[in-house]
Amino acid sequence: MVSHLIFTDFYSKKFQKMKYSSDSEDNKKETIYTYYFTEQEKYAKIYGSKTLVFIQIGKFYEAYCTRKKGYVNLAELEPLLNIKFIRRDDKPIKDGKPPKPNQFGINCVAISKNLSIMVNHGYTVVLFDQKSDGETIERECVGVYSPGTYLSDIQMQEANYLLSVYISEEKQLTCNKNLMAIGLSLVDISTGTNIIHEFYSNKFDERFGLDELVRMMQTFRPVESVIYYHPVNIDESAIKNVKLYLELDKYHNVHFYIYHNNKGEDALNLLTENSFKINFQNDYLAQIYEMNNQLTLNKKQSPLEILGLERRNYAAVSLMMMLKYIAEHNVLLLKNLSYPEIYLYNKHLILGNNAIEQLNVIDSNNLELYNSKISSVFDVINKTSTPMGKRFLKDNLLNPLSQENKKEIIKRYDYIEALIQGNIFKEIKTELKNIYDIERLHRRMAVGAIVPYEFTRLDNYYKATNRVYSVIKDNDVIKSIIPMNIFKEFVEYQVKYNKEFDTEKMANHANFGEISESFFRKGIHEDLDKIQEKIDYIQSLIKSTNYYFTSIIKDKCKKLGNKEILSMESNDREGYYFTISKSNEKILKQEIDKKKGIIKIDLTIGETLDIKKDDIVFKQLPKGRTKVFMAQLAEYTIKLPSLTEKLTELIKKKFIKSMVTYYSNHKSMLHQITRFVSEIDFLVSGAIVAKEYYYCKPSILSENSIPSYLQAKDLRHVIVERLCDETVYVPNDIELGNVPNIIHTKNKKDSSIEEVSIDETDKFKKVLGKKCNGIVLFSNNWAGKSTCMKSVGIAIILAQIGYYVPATEFNYEPYMALYARITGNDNIFKGLSSFALEMTELDAILMRTEKQGSNTLVIGDEVCKGTEDISGRAIVASALVSLSECDSTFIFSSHLHDIQNIDEVKSLNNLRVYHLRTEYDEENDCIIFDRKLMPGSGPSVYGLLVARYLVKNPKFINRAEIIKKRLTNDINVNLIPKKSNYNKDLLVKQCMICRYIPTTEYHKELESHHIHFQKNCWTDGKIKEKPYLSKNKLYNLVVLCRKCHNKVHQGEIIINGYTDTTIGPLLDYNMDIKKKIINGIKAVDDLEKSFKFSNNKSQIQKTKNTTVKKIQTSKKNNLVCEYA
């Protein structure tokens, strides 16, 4: 029977016992050490070198090591767990005996917390518990815990995936090649989520299988992986190359094995001949997924067919491996496991070639940012309140919906729009804050691991969920997120368990320690009620007796501090008794003597207890106390511990059974409730982001599947615009693909893309409004081309998870695939040179765009920069032609200006060329970045422009610096600059127009001025003209003296804002030329006065003429802003 294979066999192998009888302490210790090292060695061979065995010794779990035995690096746990490591092997040998092993112990009460820490740091932990019958002590293995198979009671927000992969190398008959067929299974033990996927290479795309496996690993980021490679022939070099290609060094806890000649190399035997046999698979899966009843009803379907695996042989093998791996750790985790969800390749936007990392979607480690709070797109748009919502958002970012899920995408836009209207999202957000991880608590219900206190919390989360539903139930759009009949069942489920449990009493039980009061309601379980009645009677005896004797003496006794006059104590032999101080003992005896033969005590339950006063015994105790013993009381109370133990055991058994039953009976409904909370949290986050950051609702015009395109107005980069504090982010208009004429007609009047002369664009045969599949973008470094290109890819991802995008208008048709090849992301793990890797990835991209090119977006940054000029131009030109011919949409950046003169490129009528303009500012010795897309290729020798800024002659610079200081009247005054009232990062130090600096001799007040006047801003601080900008950010503030400030408000000076340059933001303003010359001559006269001690009159005149000339011809006055 499979049940025997899974359950009985597991326990017989894993729960091995060790017995020893009473003996000398030294002999027992020697036995323990020998046993420990045997088990440590055995389990390390099975689970790997990072395996730790802990055995229970009394109240501690202990581990041992010497320099050669056990886990020799045991001392590394000391800083990790903050527990002392006891070193013993450095002590001298005594009586010919070696020193005892080093020791590390964890208190039993703290094992759960420390186990979680060890597992999260990649250890596999094996626990042995201690049991005793009084004569012998037994120790047995109670669990094996690894990162992917540990069901923690500590709530985690991230997914916790275990990955199982079967890679089979298949020999081909039609060609002399071996191709990869791969089956993949994923499970999150903490939630029960189960995913399977199967894919293959083909003779035209041999690397597809491994590339797809890499993509899945990058997407789901498993905490533990088991990979079996089944090659045709054993070739160590080929095996090494596979491991390098999969970049396994980037992941933790990877177990890589080889299967060959019907034999695997792992100690667990995860893959055997039986794993490939259909009958064995059906029996095994029927047992795991409890399909026996279903099989009776569906005699025509096997378990493989029910699970959709009948045509997915490789996925079935990977699933078998994973289930066996879980069983070898903790078989109970297989209980109530969800049916595997088949990953449908065409239902998700394929983020190929590691686009997730290259576009900084999630937790990027290649984005050079100094703001640790924002390192990815996820950091910007995550406004979720619950762990489920957070996981739902992250899962969608990693697996956006594809064109085939267009209806769902549009539905999400409508949901967010409805949430924004009337600010409904704010009310829902308030309730979502009261909900934590329902999904993981449901999983703990499913496996019977939940404790009473957790169910109380779950009940509170349900109540908050009810309140969320009450907010949306009358909204015709949002209420469709969850069917009404599902929520009706949810309410009925709550009514049902509240009839069974008193959830308030549950809150007192964080575990199944001693329970003296049942939280099951009376009448539910007769056996519990009977035990509870006995316990209640005994507790009434204790309480009433204490109250009676205290009441007859309390007015005459001395009470010491907060101590009770009569203290209740107990022991196993005598049950409960009272203790009293010696001084109060006399008073109590006197009061008892006044009573007649029988003392009648009224109990709280309405009965009476008769106590003979002669049966009350006083016995002296140490420390000035006296024991007051009553036989009638002891007769009952001595039974209390055993009754409490029996009650606790019964409650635990019945509670776990109820939990598993509730979950099994309402499994589908509970799953949909979890989905409802996750999705509404996800949508509320989208509404908050759209409202707060002024994102726009994307528009999908066609209901049918058509070639993909995008048309964005004022598109911004999600991350970069949030980091722009000193200068305004410059948005751009982007158009790719065959944009419908209706959009061009709509935007014809207000299109911000500059018209281009026929001569300039003739070679590309392109006119605005016609089909444009691709863009080639030229610019020098730092100009923002990567930011511009990434903004397109990120906007598509946001749009295809159903979120609004950072633009003022965004029209598009969803894509099926997005590939990125961006500079600075070379990966040496694959064992290829930078250029070889680039060509390998380019080859894969071009090959995969051929199949669905019209629905593919490709982003390539500086392709072929790793080779010489002629080859580079030829490769880039050929790539542009290939992508254009298959109708894919793409943006390529390049430094190779000559490609536009290649005949094949000239002939492309669906390609457009742009550049990002930069200028060199001689006066300020800096490069000014325009950041705006301009038609045409721009200057081809901009490298010289950069060189003028970067290449310095020290002697020349020093001399220029001296002259510059004289010309700008740079007076050094040791005054502490003030900070602006509007923004503490702005130093009020110098007028940014006339460059006046306050002095102690003559002081004019400096003021902070809003470039966009405050009267032109909304009450929430947003600028009316540009609502995505805030009035008190540095980009909208300028320091002015009173004189210049008045000129600004009189219109004599017009401030345009700041321009981004290599030396920081520079102020751009215009003023009346005549007034400017007059002011300039006055400045020169002041300068001449400052040279009154100089004899070099020719130098003074030369400086004067130069300054006036500059003032006359300049349209900008650029002064670097100074910030705190």
Swiss-Prot record:
Binding site residues for ATP: 779-786
What is one Gene Ontology biological process annotated in the Swiss-Prot or TrEMBL record?
mismatch repair
Fetch the InterPro entries from UniProt: DNA_mismatch_repair_MutS-lik_N, DNA_mismatch_repair_MutS/MSH, DNA_mismatch_repair_MutS_C, DNA_mismatch_repair_MutS_core, DNA_mismatch_repair_MutS_N, DNA_mismatch_repair_MutS_sf, HNH_nuc, MutS
| Gene3D superfamilies assigned to the protein according to its UniProt record, in alphabetical order | 1.10.1420.10, DNA repair protein MutS, domain I, MutS, connector domain, P-loop containing nucleotide triphosphate hydrolases
User: What are this entry's molecular-function GO terms?
Assistant: ATP binding; ATP-dependent DNA damage sensor activity; mismatched DNA binding
Q: Which SMART domains match?
A: MUTSac, MUTSd
Annotated keywords: ATP-binding, DNA damage, DNA repair, DNA-binding, Nucleotide-binding
**What family name appears in the similarity comment?**
Belongs to the DNA mismatch repair MutS family.
Do you know which PANTHER family this protein is assigned to?
DNA MISMATCH REPAIR PROTEIN, DNA MISMATCH REPAIR PROTEIN MUTS FAMILY MEMBER
Q: Tell me, what does this protein do in biology?
A: May be involved in DNA-mismatch repair.
Protein's UniProt name: Putative DNA mismatch repair protein mutS homolog L359
Give the organism, scientific name: Acanthamoeba polyphaga mimivirus (APMV)
